[in-house]
């Protein structure tokens, strides 16, 4: 037999961005509780609004199933005395398990006999267990929390009401003075209390009180109303998943409405208008069918269609004030030159241990010019780098960016173009912030890519130099994002930048600038490990086998595009018939070469058989060809070596008693192993 179960936590309005994650957390905690208590159920449904977190468990069993439990006791030699009677240890075990001594049996595990018991456990009634769900509710955690009144509990918002029902029965418990009942609350202004007679009545009972408890249904209602408005007005209202998710969790009964603003505000940069509407007011911007921004907006009301005109006028008034402020800020920004703005950066501290923004920009300039040298850029390009790195943070002191931090870079590009900077420099000002997320867009220009890499590497290494690195989930300065972004940009451009050398040179530069809390060798090692870990994430995203990832990162991690190519090519050919014997042969070379002693060079005159000469000849050809080969051809070259390597080992005793011959053979294998290890640590690859 089964019944439905309903748990609703009624709250004061939660921040919209935490509603979905909170109800999913509640679902998981209830699911875990059910599994831990071995209570069967069909399905769990979740419902959420800004004022409630709810789970409805369908067909929850009315009692736990009876079950047989086993328990292991002491070893037989301890359980029996010399006369074969039960020892105190055995009798104590039986008592602790609430069974009679005659119920004890023996079972052999790995050659040793132990006492075992089997006992039937009668399942408890679900109603006897459900009150412990109080601990599930109070154990929830949130990014932001508060306590209220004299209560010790910290929660996302004060708990105002609770429902816990198993069928028609109310499950009694109390949290912060609020007792469970079968009564919920409707819309704050349109609804009344809602009595829930059965858990399955919950959605409809709340709908009668102007609450759509299903977040997906609220979202769909908003989308449908937006589409209707588009058709009616011949507008475009572009899809914005983040904004749609937020407004869905801001309202309980959504009604879409439109408003207008003065056309003169269209003279503001489009990004300023859109950001004002979206970020400050949670409005949807409106476009023509040709993609032109129009002097209208769409918002979502938490209510019905009554007095929509009045609501629209109120929203227009608020937006008008916002746009007036934005227009003032923009006009003020146009009065200052870029160089005047740059001068103010010397008064802004980047970090107390790393100096001002001006000092950071100077360091980034050195890094960017260093990278340009590695990439063989021309002098004209370097002059662009110098101008760019002298100004690229200037928009941080503008009024618009002060009001809308998310427009940094975008406004820099616009102001730079207005003041006559080269388009390439203006674009790079915007692009140096990219990517803005793990999967975000990358810079599309060479100059933007270079400055983005330089800025991110300088930030990363600078913080490591002053002993500030991510710990666990804490990364307040976004260093993982910086490293990941730099690696992605390098990969996308296919730039063979010697990262180990670059890291070392940047560390030396940072120390020369005064960032000296850790020895250079420690910083270099930590940064290299950190970058390798970011590479692991990228390779995992390419669905590369973990053993192959270990192999290529253990090889030469210097040139990032080549490393990623090596991983992809090894992964692609891992199922080929020749792959396993090739890896085994190469691994054998590497393992034996570890016995090589420094200083010994290969002397062909000491070869005793044709197989040594054949391997030497192949190695000499490999030396000549290797640098010019594509990555896939390097792997093919190793595969072609396999028969020569096998023949060599079949006919040559490397560890001979003759030290001169032994060392000469080890020297030959060591030279070959150096090429193999540069490609990958082949012994990390699983070919079993």
From Swiss-Prot:
PROSITE patterns the UniProt entry points to: AA_TRNA_LIGASE_II_GLYAB
Gene Ontology cellular-component terms listed: cytosol
GO BP term, pick one: glycyl-tRNA aminoacylation
Annotated localization: Cytoplasm
Primary location group: cytoplasm
Keyword annotations of the record: Aminoacyl-tRNA synthetase, ATP-binding, Cytoplasm, Ligase, Nucleotide-binding, Protein biosynthesis
Reaction catalysis annotation: tRNA(Gly) + glycine + ATP = glycyl-tRNA(Gly) + AMP + diphosphate
InterPro entries per UniProt: DALR_anticod-bd, Gly-tRNA-synth_bsu, Gly-tRNA-synth_heterodimer
Enzyme Commission designation: 6.1.1.14
Molecular functions (GO terms): arginine-tRNA ligase activity; ATP binding; glycine-tRNA ligase activity
PANTHER family per the UniProt record, alphabetical: GLYCINE--TRNA LIGASE, CHLOROPLASTIC_MITOCHONDRIAL 2 (PTHR30075:SF2), GLYCYL-TRNA SYNTHETASE (PTHR30075)
Family: Belongs to the class-II aminoacyl-tRNA synthetase family.
Subunit structure: Tetramer of two alpha and two beta subunits.
Protein name: Glycine--tRNA ligase beta subunit
Species assigned in the record: Listeria monocytogenes serotype 4b (strain CLIP80459)
